[in-house]
Amino acid sequence: MTMSVRFRIAALSTSLLLSSLATAASAEERCSNASLVGSYAFQVDGANISAPLPGGPGPFAAVGRNTYDGKGGMQGTIVISSNGVIINATYAGTYSVDADCTGVKSATLNVGATVDFSFVIDDDLREIRMIVSDPGFAVSGSARKLSTDAKSKE
């Protein structure tokens, strides 16, 4: 091979390597508040160890629907079972998503409680895995984007 051909092969190899590194970096840092838009159905369960909720300490489970605005705001409805006591509530709150698709959110329920979560978004932004990050809970769960949501079809 001539020097010119070797140089071209080396330049092409370097170019391919750099473009694949850039693609990998952008894939790792692809999330922001705008990544969460639309409605998600969620479920969480675990234990209320010492949080001040009706029913007191004991098993804890909840299901609901959360709607994100893509700008750091959210609202939703939730049905909670706290040690067998059923609580129907609505909430509003805020969230923040980091570039690595991890985040935090805080929901203030109309029954006087505020619950904080840490989460990660996966499955091409369609699924969320979360834990309650407040003391007094050992609760985890997941949320799935609703395909019937008009915004999810855009």
Each language-model region and where it sits:
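Bacterial N-terminal signal peptides
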Residues: 11-20
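Bacterial N-terminal signal peptides that target proteins for export
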Residues: 2-12
